[in-house]
């Protein structure tokens, strides 16, 4: 385990927050890399345009099925994001959340709270290595088709977000042999958790 420093995104008055004992990306099990096992997630945030609002989406992608979840949250505080992630993933059966890989943003400062509540392990990508959680980054890009950069996300209704996520999860993907993430996710939920 290493020590991790989170840096506030503000340009002036940076306040590093030292987080001890984080798990680096390279410590993940091989089953996470090769996508053979269900229940490994990637997490990130999609933010509003500069100066528009503090509202953002907490996003989660299951690596094997490419199933995607986005939750609108009022700000990027660690406590806010932790509550949203716990609320979304705690609805799933035990065994559906084994690991979560995220970046080193300050919004993940409450990672131990997430681990404890979900019974999973969290791993942190290396700085400036977005490819280490590429599934989530790719899906965030697809979400931007509905909510382009610069958009005030505080104005997005939960119903509209839910509808757009349903469209994304119902889109057949070549990487999944033209199966839909929603269908695969439901299939693996039944297999792993019954």
Q: Where do the protein language model's features map onto the residues?
A:
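Extended hydrophobic
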Residues: 55, 62-63
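Mobile genetic element proteins and their domesticated derivatives, centered on retroelements
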Residues: 3, 44, 60, 66, ...
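Active-site beta-loop-alpha junctions of metal-dependent nucleic acid enzymes
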Residues: 49, 53, 70-94
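Mobile-element integrase/transposase regions
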Residues: 13-56
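Polytopic alpha-helical membrane proteins, predominantly small-molecule transporters/carriers
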Residues: 57, 67, 94, 121-125
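Charged alpha-helix within mobile-element recombinases
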Residues: 115-194
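Acidic/histidine-rich, metal-coordinating catalytic segments
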Residues: 95-110, 128
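Conserved short alpha-helical interface segments
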Residues: 1-19
């Amino acid at each position: 385990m290493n020590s991790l420093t989170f840096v506030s995104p503000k340009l002036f008055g940076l306040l590093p927050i030292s987080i001890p004992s984080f798990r680096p990306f390279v410590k993940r099990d091989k089953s996470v890399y090769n996508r053979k096992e269900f229940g490994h997630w990637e997490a990130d945030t999609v933010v509003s345009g500069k100066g528009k609002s503090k509202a953002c989406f907490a996003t989660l992608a299951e690596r094997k099925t490419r199933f995607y979840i986005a939750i609108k949250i009022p700000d990027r505080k660690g406590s806010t994001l932790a509550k949203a992630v716990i609320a979304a993933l705690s609805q799933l059966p035990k065994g559906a959340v084994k690991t979560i890989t995220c970046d080193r943003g300050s919004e993940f400062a409450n990672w131990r709270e997430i681990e404890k509540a979900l019974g999973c392990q969290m791993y942190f990508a290396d700085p400036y290595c977005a490819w280490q959680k590429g599934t989530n980054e790719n899906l965030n890009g697809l979400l931007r088709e509905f909510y382009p950069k610069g958009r005030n996300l505080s104005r997005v209704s939960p119903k509209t977000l839910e509808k757009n996520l349903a469209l994304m999860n119902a889109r057949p993907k070549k990487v999944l042999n033209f199966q839909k993430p929603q269908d695969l996710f439901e299939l693996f939920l039944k297999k792993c958790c019954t």
